[in-house]
Amino acid sequence: MTDRENVLFEDNADRFTVSGPEMDSHYGTGAVFHRRGGHFGSIAPIRVPESFFPDNSSVLYTIRPDGVSLISPREKSDGIKYSTEILMGDGASDIMIVHSIKNTSHERKKLSVWSSTALRAGGLEVIPQSFGDTQPMQPNRILALWPGTTLTDPRLFAGERYLTIRQDPEMEKEFILGVNNITGWAAYVLPDTTLIKRYVHDETSCYPNHDCSYRTRVSGCFAELDSFSPIYLVEPGEGIRHVDNLSLFTTRNGVNPVDETSIENFIHNLC
């Protein structure tokens, strides 16, 4: 087995944290959320402080034949309990990550699961455009932009079938974009490895972020590939869950970020 660089982002310098008066008043003085990198799950719509529980305590874990289960302590301020299953059976090519959120409070909550995968610098993100309904009088795509994000950003290429976003270590400004990703996948192409993230988009449900089931956040350090469950009304004692499937492929030739035929052939050869 050869040594390969981790495809996930690692915040070894602890640069990406959330703290301040809102965190202090909600979780206690000195509360800090550390992004750390890698993959994590939380609640959406994304907001401070609720989506940034400083989960710095020990977790309960169970080793299973096909993976591991992780259960965080009950989050007392909001009555939320998080659990994560990381599963990979013998001979499987995918890692399945199941995020579950239970409402342990006495109040109904309106929630979505936020499943975030942060990947290391130097890659190209590929997002399919979702055409959905083709009735000429109805819109069939949603594009959501966050404050500070512009469509003239040089990292973005908007084609007829795909969007591509380059992660550029020289550009610190964050680029954040959401889409109604009906096909339920996105790819991140590194020089020697490609990761594909898959999930199920339910066209009959409503999603956060102006009905976008997918969001990306690209900075000078990483690219974050985020999927979301539908929004649910969660009664006390009930829970919701969301599943991501992550696949890794060894790739050498890369892809032309502005050539949609090249992109389509590249993805087709992987899948």
Spans of features found by a protein language model:
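Surface-exposed acidic/polar loop and edge beta-strand patches at domain peripheries
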Residues: 1-96, 104-271
